[in-house]
Design a protein with these regions (language model features):
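Terminal targeting signals and extreme-terminal segments of soluble enzymes
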Residues: 1-81, 89-160
């Protein structure tokens, strides 16, 4: 019997689809941001307990990207299986900072490293200045139970 692998809470895996490649069947760099979004939403869903979006009293919180940076350090081709690890840098405010590491599953070669920064807004485009207590507690609990998802960004900034 084969033991099944349990993925860390900050990891997703997927294969490069043909539609995501150029004529040489190498993935197009623009797909990296779509994959980062998938990793970010998967991490948020696990962090706040099964919800893909954060809500405050039934009102959704939006987190538009305000800054992004990517270093393309390798490449992947059609059919390659990739691993995306998403990390978060805890903040004193409601600003969200995510870091990403995209690697090939077969050999662990790094394909891309990146970061995105986000502000948090509520209905009407108003800034959210403080996490609701319930959301803040879920985040603290998640960070203490999953220290591997937390970063200070140093391992990423050096290569960006």
């Amino acid at each position: 019997m084969t033991a099944s692998r349990i993925a860390p809470p900050n990891e997703i895996r997927f294969s490069v689809r043909f539609a995501e490649t150029d004529m040489a069947r190498v993935y197009h760099h623009s797909n990296t941001f779509v994959w980062f979004e998938a990793g970010r939403f998967a991490l948020i869903e696990k962090m706040i307990g099964g919800q893909p979006m954060i809500e405050v009293d039934g009102v959704p919180i939006f987190a538009p990207v305000t800054k992004t940076r990517v270093s393309f350090t390798g490449f992947a081709r059609f059919g390659d299986e990739l691993r995306l690890e998403t990390f978060i840098k805890p903040q004193e405010t409601t600003k969200l900072v995510f870091y990403y590491r995209l690697t090939k599953v077969v050999d662990g070669a790094t394909v891309a490293l990146g970061t995105t920064e986000h502000v948090t807004l509520v209905e009407g485009g108003r800034f959210l200045f403080r996490w609701p207590e319930a959301v803040g507690e879920k985040m603290k609990t998640f960070f203490s139970e999953n220290p591997g998802v937390v970063t200070d960004g140093r391992g990423f900034d050096a290569k960006l």
